[in-house]
UniProtKB/Swiss-Prot annotation:
Residue numbers bearing the Phosphoserine modification: 26, 346, 539
GO biological process: binding of sperm to zona pellucida; chaperone mediated protein folding independent of cofactor; chaperone-mediated protein folding; positive regulation of protein localization to Cajal body; positive regulation of telomerase RNA localization to Cajal body; positive regulation of telomere maintenance via telomerase; protein folding; protein stabilization
Induction: Down-regulated in response to enterovirus 71 (EV71) infection (at protein level).
Gene: CCT5
Description of how the protein assembles with itself and partners: Component of the chaperonin-containing T-complex (TRiC), a hexadecamer composed of two identical back-to-back stacked rings enclosing a protein folding chamber. Each ring is made up of eight different subunits: TCP1/CCT1, CCT2, CCT3, CCT4, CCT5, CCT6A/CCT6, CCT7, CCT8. Interacts with PACRG. Interacts with DNAAF4. Interacts with DLEC1. Interacts with SPMAP2.
Reactions listed under catalytic activity: ATP + H2O = ADP + phosphate + H(+)
Protein origin, superkingdom: Eukaryota
Broad enzyme group: hydrolase
Modification note: Ubiquitinated by the DCX(DCAF12) complex specifically recognizes the diglutamate (Glu-Glu) at the C-terminus, leading to its degradation.
Binding site for ATP: 53, 106-107, 422
UniProt-annotated binding residues for ADP: 53, 105-107, 175, 422, 492, 508, 513
Gene3D superfamilies noted in UniProt: GroEL, GroEL-like equatorial domain, TCP-1-like chaperonin intermediate domain
Descriptive protein name: T-complex protein 1 subunit epsilon
Naturally occurring in which organism (per UniProt): Homo sapiens
Keyword vocabulary terms for this entry: Acetylation, ATP-binding, Chaperone, Cytoplasm, Cytoskeleton, Disease variant, Hydrolase, Isopeptide bond, Neuropathy, Nucleotide-binding, Phosphoprotein, Ubl conjugation
Length: 541
């Protein structure tokens, strides 16, 4: 709405404008501003709603360059959405913060925030002040989070018995593209995390888990490698394809004759000068190769390249080498093999070599694609998950799915309490909030009831996406939860014949669920407190 704004008058009664270009600015105020925000948030939430749960549908996102991404991951969908409205951008940030902190539940948090705003709209229409709604939501969120603590169960995080961890990872992977082999993927994710986890600090360093993918093969061919995979091959095709008991020199210095640091030029006036230069370079290369071999190294990994002459000399001297290895890979190789990165050639000693039981080059299908696998390393706390798939899109989606699973297992190691999925926790919290609302003597009880209704949107979306009647299914499960006093009863999305999520092993982490409720509530409170928007108008050329 374009607004001229309020005019001020001088002592002679002449009008003047206070704000620059006030006539070209657009402005929304009061309820109109709130309704605009709620409409934008609902539009984003409704887009995400169909992606929720094991039967959630995927979205195809096409970017400006025409690249296609098919995904079910809430954070990815929102980050690729080209949103223009400022509140829709806040929803994108909300999903991102859930992804950064927890890694899973990115779709649910947006759907919940959208439902809370939808309920708030009805309360605003009844004349309740937005601040009272925001305060009621805050009280309700506190009740829901306390109730989650009461209904949570602890799982045993034990390296010997990984079944509870695998079941939790399977719940996360159930809604993804990889659900055809989600048991295998869950086992890979659990083994990867437990290999690198620091159980004393109860933390996981994700830098030690590398996820690589290669087009070809099936998703079932995905495997966990206790070591490092590098997307490179040996520098010369005649070098051996396998090096056993490898002692690795990890070089980040250029593999070439030394050059002066200052600006210089070399005058070559005759053939003899050129031959002398060639001879000097060859001698220097041989000297450098000899220096590497004297330390006991039988494999050189270089961050920089070297020319064909050096490559030929390396082959003659039986020293396999790999060139142009990136910085992160060099660091991971150093961690895995227990070696030290050598920035200057003169500093190379036997103590700085890394050790690996086997380094081999593997080929894929009929293509010329090759990769290096460094296994049986000195330090087994660096692992690589190697994903295969029919096309690039499937591999990228599998990477995102595994990221969610890895995050969930890390959260369980940090805090081993869980709640039950399938909407069971949300229904139980909604019942607890409704009971608490009846005890609230002030106007906030309306907002608390609205909060309970909003929580029920998640189980309703789950049943809707599974092809059931959402309202009928929801009322049946809610009635059973009250009658049987069992907070583990949820929506039977997979049609297994039981609503008990404990029997179905549908498990979610407690910290993830708490974070969902608190983040969505904070976001909605912030939106409800905005009553005025000023936007710059179109600039006149």
């Amino acid at each position: 709405m374009a607004s001229m704004g309020t005019l001020a008058f001088d002592e002679y009664g002449r009008p003047f404008l206070i704000i620059k270009d006030q006539d070209r600015k657009s402005r929304l105020m009061g309820l109109e501003a709130l309704k605009s925000h709620i409409m934008a948030a609902k539009a984003v939430a409704n887009t995400m709603r169909t992606s929720l749960g094991p039967n959630g549908l995927d979205k195809m996102m096409v970017d400006k360059d025409g690249d296609v991404t098919v995904t079910n991951d809430g954070a990815t969908i929102l980050s690729m959405m080209d949103v223009d409205h400022q509140i829709a951008k806040l929803m994108v940030e909300l999903s991102k913060s859930q992804d950064d902190e927890i890694g899973d539940g990115t779709t649910g948090v947006v759907v919940l925030a959208g439902a809370l705003l939808e309920e708030a709209e009805q309360l605003l229409d009844r004349g309740i002040h937005p601040i009272r709604i925001a305060d009621g939501y805050e009280q309700a969120a506190r009740v829901a989070i306390e109730h989650l603590d009461k209904i949570s169960d602890s799982v045993l995080v034990d390296i010997k018995d990984t079944e509870p961890l695998i079941q939790t990872a399977k719940t996360t992977l159930g809604s993804k593209v990889v659900n055809s082999c989600h048991r295998q993927m869950a086992e890979i994710a659990v083994n990867a995390v437990l290999t690198v986890a620091d159980m004393e600090r109860r933390d996981v360093d994700f830098e030690l888990i590398k996820v690589e993918g290669k087009v070809g093969g099936r998703l079932e061919d995905t495997k966990l490698i206790k070591g490092v995979i590098v997307d490179k091959d040996f520098s010369h095709p005649q070098m051996p394809k396998k090096v056993e008991d490898a002692k690795i020199a990890i070089l980040t210095c250029p593999f070439e004759p030394p050059k002066p640091k200052t600006k210089h030029k070399l005058d070559v006036t005759s053939v003899e000068d050129y031959k002398a230069l060639q001879k000097y370079e060859k001698e220097k290369f041989e000297e450098m190769i000899q220096q590497i071999k004297e330390t006991g190294a039988n494999l050189a990994i270089c961050q920089w390249g070297f020319d064909d002459e050096a490559n030929h000399l390396l082959l003659q001297n039986n020293l396999p080498a790999v060139r142009w290895v990136g910085g992160p890979e060099i660091e991971l190789i150093a961690i895995a093999t227990g070696g030290r990165i050598v920035p200057r050639f003169s500093e190379l000693t036997a103590e700085k070599l890394g050790f690996a039981g086997l380094v081999q080059e593997i080929s894929f299908g009929t293509t010329k694609d090759k990769m290096l696998v460094i296994e049986q390393c000195k330090n087994s706390r660096a692992v690589t998950i190697f994903i295969r798939g029919g096309n690039k899109m499937i591999i990228e989606e599998a990477k995102r799915s595994l990221h969610d699973a890895l995050c969930v297992i890390r959260n369980l190691i940090r805090d081993n309490r869980v709640v039950y999925g399938g909407g069971a926790a949300e229904i139980s919290c909604a019942l607890a909030v409704s009971q608490e609302a009846d005890k609230c003597p002030t106007l906030e009880q309306y907002a608390m009831r609205a909060f309970a209704d909003a929580l029920e949107v998640i189980p309703m979306a789950l049943s809707e996406n599974s092809g059931m009647n959402p309202i009928q299914t929801m009322t049946e499960v809610r009635a059973r939860q009250v009658k049987e006093m069992n907070p583990a009863l949820g929506i039977d999305c997979l049609h297994k014949g039981t609503n008990d999520m404990k029997q179905q092993h549908v498990i979610e982490t407690l910290i993830g669920k708490k974070q969902q409720i608190s983040l969505a509530t904070q976001m909605v409170r912030m939106i409800l407190k905005i009553d005025d928007i000023r936007k710059p108008g179109e600039s006149e050329e």
